Amino acid sequence: MRTLWIVAVWLMGVEGNLYQFGKMIKNKTGKPAMFSYSAYGCYCGWGGQGKPQDPSDRCCFMHDCCYTRVNNCSPKMTLYSYRFENGDIICGDNDPCRKAVCECDREAAICLGENVNTYDEKYRFYSSSYCTEEESEKC
């Protein structure tokens, strides 16, 4: 179900943070975010519960945790300014909410890039039925 929702969002052309985050992921991993990470493991994609399946999935878990610490805005839809410079992602917004969301996305994209060698096709389009709430970790 979450896979269908993610695909629907991308097909509708929703602008905002999801698009920007996808560009960061592509920059750091070389992989298209929508097809590689939109439903990867238990945490990459919309929602998340259970135990992270590998280091790449743990990056998404940490990203979800980061979003829970962002107050007074909608992280998944907040637009922010950033740029790529000499291989780095630079968040350039002075608004505290936008800056925090950008930093969450930046850290996750870097983490995914650092763990791209752990990416395992068996976790792509992973069934959420394997991700049980009883095994969920706390942020």
UniProtKB/Swiss-Prot annotation:
Keywords: Calcium, Disulfide bond, Hydrolase, Lipid degradation, Lipid metabolism, Metal-binding, Secreted, Signal. GO terms for molecular function: calcium ion binding; calcium-dependent phospholipase A2 activity; phospholipid binding. It is an enzyme of class 3 (hydrolase). The keyword Disulfide bond applies. Its cofactor is Ca(2+). Expressed by the venom gland. PROSITE patterns: PA2_ASP, PA2_HIS. Disulfide bonds join C42-C131, C44-C60, C59-C111, C65-C139, C66-C104, C73-C97, C91-C102. The keyword Hydrolase applies. Ca(2+) binds at Y43, G45, G47, D64. It is found in: Secreted. One of its GO terms (cellular component) is extracellular region. Belongs to the phospholipase A2 family. Group II subfamily. D49 sub-subfamily. This is Acidic phospholipase A2 5. It comes from Echis pyramidum leakeyi. The lineage of its organism: Eukaryota, Metazoa, Chordata, Craniata, Vertebrata.
